Amino acid sequence: MCYSDLTFLSRVFGPVERLIYRICRIDEHEEQHWTAYTAAMLMFSVVGLLVLYGLQRLQYFLPLNPQGFPGVAPDLAFNTASSFTTNTNWQAYSGESTMSYLVQMAGLAFHNFVSAATGIALAIAFIRGIARREAKTLGNFWVDLTRTTLYVLLPFCIIGALALVSQGVVQNFSPYTQATLVEPQQVEKTDDRGNKTVETVTVQTIAQGPVASQEIIKELGTNGGGFFNANSAHPFENPTPFSNFLEMIAVFAISSGLTYTLGRMTGNQKHGWAVFSAMVILFLAGFFTVYYFEARGNPIFNQHGVTQAAIEADGQEQAGGNMEGKEVRFGIVNSALWATITTDASCGAVNSMHDSFTPLGGMIPLLNIMLGEIIFGGVGAGLYGMLVMIVLTVFIAGLMVGRTPEYLGKKIEAKDVKMAMLYVLVFAFSILVFS
């Protein structure tokens, strides 16, 4: 897909690709200088942000809003639009009580696709810059974006969504269901004046919608923004251990595959495997650390005589370890594994609450976040994040041994190191200054 015009999917998606080029007046054979490539990416992102903002503000007047949700407030709409446009997927709202089905699909899920495709396109352009010798161009952003969406993301998402539906993930356009409780519940409420009242709840609202189609791209594109507030801990997003396994595989699928792409495009497959191996070693070290401390349980509970050992006898079952904030159907292993994967990949999807981890168990997810996407990382971003680290390492190693630093046959010059350091400092600068 990156360096060949034909794939085995060309018969299916080729006509669609050519139609998109014709409608958008894109010359697929025209390549762009890095400045034009960057400008196209920024322009596409800004337009996408404005469209998503408008969708949220006009939500009440648009179709596929069976619950009649009002338009999203201006500040929240901008927050959400900028978040999903940049593949951040930070959420300051509950999806099931704020967003209509149309906004979830045409707005949020759409940006799950194109933000991921943008990241992959930038990674491919980065690799082209390393692999090419004399060329002054890096490819065509519009072609890379289109092909990534059609030939990579869409096929995997179609298959993945069907697999998730088979496991019980919801996919419909039905209004929320009002279910009568078998046993009414008494709920104590406090009004603005501090007066307490007791309300009897007899009906439960069961939220639903086109979840499976958004869930798979949420993981495959390392987006992370959930259809429901509970994210992948919600049984309608992630009902079974097998769906949990599929979603974890999806998170790492593209980021790990891009290391192979690196080897193929540079003509040095051993180097691609070396990068992959470095990522795997760091990932496994993180996972086993999280699992060890979570399986041991909370030491404070031990002081109070609370049993945290696994029990399955005399009709009693207990998973063991620190189960606070974790789903029983996943247990310690799947929760620790998911926490490591999602923070390695900057995905943001969760199947347990990381704040409820033990201090040392929760340290690893926090460390993964602070590393800035080098252990597989987000789709595209993880690869070029690791490559930046490699450039800096090669440069420092060259200084130590007194040799001119080279990477894949190219000299590492002062301007290259300056750009690499700029990449590193922007991350720290953004956190320190804006906090």
What are the roles of these predicted feature ranges?
Residues 77-89, 109-121, 125, 153:
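Mid-bilayer segments of alpha-helical transmembrane spans in multi-pass integral membrane proteins
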Residues 1-79, 123-124, 131-139, 143-184, ...:
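N-terminal alpha-helical transmembrane segments of multi-pass membrane transport
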Residues 242-273, 280-281, 346-418:
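Long hydrophobic segments that form regular secondary structure
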Residues 60-108, 170-249, 304-381:
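P-loop potassium selectivity filter motif centered on the GYG triad
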Residues 42-46, 106-117, 126, 149, ...:
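Hydrophobic alpha-helical transmembrane segments of multi-pass membrane proteins
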Residues 41-55, 147-170, 254, 270-297, ...:
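Selective recognition of specific alpha-helical transmembrane segments in multi-pass small-molecule
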